[in-house]
Regions:
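A general alpha-helix detector
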Residues: 9, 47-48, 84
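Short beta-strand segments at enzyme active-site cores
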Residues: 40-41, 113
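Active-site-proximal, substrate-binding regions of enzyme catalytic domains
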Residues: 25, 45-73, 78-80
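Acidic, PIN/NYN-like endoribonuclease modules and their adjacent C-terminal/linker elements
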Residues: 2, 104-142
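Active-site neighborhoods of divalent-metal-dependent phosphate/nucleic-acid chemistry enzymes
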Residues: 73-116
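Short, well-structured N-terminal submotif of metal-dependent ribonuclease cores
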Residues: 1-39, 53-60, 121, 135-142
Length: 142
């Protein structure tokens, strides 16, 4: 199974945000253990680098993001994906549209996000982290 993990779920882990941390961490563990193939959109990296600025030094941010890149694969954004996202009028948020473009490119089964409502017109179904874990908890056992 392939999942694209949205920036907000990654931020939950990196910032230790309650009450989301445990669930997000479990999903990353599934990726690290190769029980699920995890992906993130390339533009999530500069977004996370910025989001983490108040809680980590620049060096800490670099290291933690390199660690994340060892767990999930980074899907790049090229001009084709950008133009396709710009042409897509079904999304209110351009960044979400780019997430969807990356999910399509990696043939993801789901976009794991805390903002599933923002992906109602997505070609790839969005699922909340807790719903994903509930649905696929048997994967954790193997």
């Amino acid at each position: 199974m392939r999942v694209l993990i949205d920036t907000n779920v990654l931020a939950d882990v990196l910032l230790g945000r309650d009450p989301y941390y445990d669930i997000a961490y479990s999903i990353l563990t599934m990726c690290a253990d190769k029980k699920v193939y995890g992906y993130m959109a390339a533009h999530s990296i500069p977004n996370l680098f910025y989001i983490l600025r108040k809680s980590m030094t620049k060096e800490e941010r670099r290291e933690v993001l390199k660690d994340i890149c060892q767990i999930v694969k980074v899907e790049g954004i090229d001009s084709f994906k950008i133009i396709s996202a710009l042409d897509n009028v079904d999304f209110d948020d351009f960044e979400d549209c780019l997430q969807e473009e990356c999910a399509v490119a990696v043939s993801a089964d789901y976009i794991v996000t805390r903002n599933a409502k923002d992906f109602v017109s997505s070609r790839i179904p969005a699922i909340l982290p807790e719903q994903f874990l509930e649905k696929y908890k048997d994967i954790m056992q193997t």
